[in-house]
Design a protein with these regions (language model features):
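Single conserved hydrophobic/aromatic residue that forms the stacking wall/gate
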Residues: 1-13
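Membrane-interface interhelical loops and short amphipathic "cap" helices
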Residues: 51-77, 125-146, 187-211, 264-281, ...
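Core alpha-helical transmembrane segments of integral membrane proteins
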Residues: 61-176, 185, 189-192
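Hydrophobic cores of alpha-helical transmembrane segments in multi-pass inner/ER membrane proteins
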Residues: 88-92, 147-162, 208-227, 285-299
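Juxtamembrane transmembrane-helix termini
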Residues: 98-105, 129-136, 160, 164, ...
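Interfacial and helix-entry/exit segments of alpha-helical transmembrane bundles
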Residues: 170-175, 236-259, 308-322
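C-terminal structured "cap/appendage" subdomains that terminate the fold
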Residues: 280-326
Length: 341
């Protein structure tokens, strides 16, 4: 008993010296950390570190959905499509501007239509698979919106290629570049659940309208580049034809963009409690709408009656679309920053 009492005295003296030197807290912290590490090692050895708790709210995926997801993961839809579309667009462009344009032959136009339709159907199949697996429309992040925009581009090209042969070339090129950006960019192709605020049909409608307007504005931009090339080759008839097409496409593109912004404001009021917050994405979308709206004022701004100035203006205006979609997502941030995830 005497030795035990003497030991207690020494312990008290030791702790008093540590307390006076300010090292007691550090020692206690080190002892606590060591104890935690020993406990973690023991739990790892016993297999009791992680004990999953069953979530009654999570439903098991059906066998069909599992098979569909396995199939979707085995087929690199974006990679296949952007390679085929870019190659097809370049070849068709060379055929269009060759000394003997092959688009004059009906058989070549039919082959082009079949290739365009095949690419569109393959893309549609991929989007249907993704929709079936996720249980929602694939328009919730940057990767999915780029996929949807490429699909819209192909649909527009299919509808217009029989009247304007260049639309097939532009459809392949524009959709190919869109899918290329989606594939090599820092976008997340994984199928993930939506956060509650994004689970809204208004959001899907808002995104689909905005992407549709961007697709039309992309066609207008390529029309402008082609018109300048034809102007340098002194082919006035082709310039006038492309100018007419751009003016026709500008009306639905601007109207759809305005509707998309309006529906986005309605959704924002439901989700965030306000229609307009001057978020960077909102500001740049409004700038895009106003700049493209200037091109309608041919009576008050007479310089827009000149085809070449009209096309140059629309080519320059497309930079606002790029800034709205890419610049804001990756550089400015804001409430729409989830779009690049």
């Amino acid at each position: 008993y005497a030795s035990r009492g003497l030991g207690d005295v020494y312990k008290r003296q030791y702790w008093n010296r540590l307390h006076q030197s300010g090292k007691q807290d550090a020692l206690l912290k080190a002892i606590t950390e060591t104890d935690e590490k020993i406990s973690l090692i023991a739990m790892l050895r016993q297999g009791t570190l992680v004990r999953p708790v069953p979530d009654t709210g999570v439903q098991r995926l059906s066998d069909r959905k599992i098979q569909a997801e396995l199939l979707y993961n085995q087929i690199p839809f974006s990679v296949i499509l952007y390679r085929i579309n870019l190659m097809g667009g370049i070849l068709l462009l060379l055929c269009q501007w060759s000394k003997r344009p092959l688009f004059r032959f009906r058989s070549f136009r039919r082959i082009t239509f079949c290739l365009l339709l095949t690419s569109f159907l393959f893309h549609t199949f991929g989007m249907i698979l993704r929709t079936y697996i996720s249980g929602r429309l694939p328009m919730s992040n940057g990767y999915e919106t780029m996929q949807f925009m490429a699909w819209i581009i192909m649909l527009i090209a299919l509808c217009l290629q029989h009247r304007f042969s260049l639309m097939a070339c532009f459809g392949f090129l524009l959709s190919g570049f869109t899918l290329l950006v989606a594939s090599i960019g820092q976008m997340n192709p994984q199928i993930t659940p939506l956060i509650p605020v994004l689970s809204s049909p208004l959001l899907s409608l808002h995104v689909s309208l905005i992407m549709m307007s961007y697709a039309l504005l992309g066609f207008i931009m390529l029309n402008g580049i082609a018109a300048i090339i034809y102007f340098r080759k002194n082919e006035e008839e082709q310039v006038e034809r492309l100018t007419l097409l751009s003016r026709i496409l500008l009306y639905p593109a601007t109207l759809i963009l305005a509707l998309g912004i309006f529906i986005g404001a309605v959704w924002a009021n439901i989700s965030w409690g306000r229609y307009w917050a001057w978020d960077p994405k909102e500001v740049w979308a409004l700038i895009t709408l106003l700049i493209y709206g200037i091109a309608f004022h041919t009576q008050s701004i007479k310089v827009f009656r000149k085809p070449i100035f009209f096309h140059i203006f629309l080519i320059a205006a497309f930079t606002t679309v790029l800034m709205t979609y890419f610049g804001v997502n990756y550089f400015l941030g804001g409430m729409h920053s989830y779009a690049n995830n």
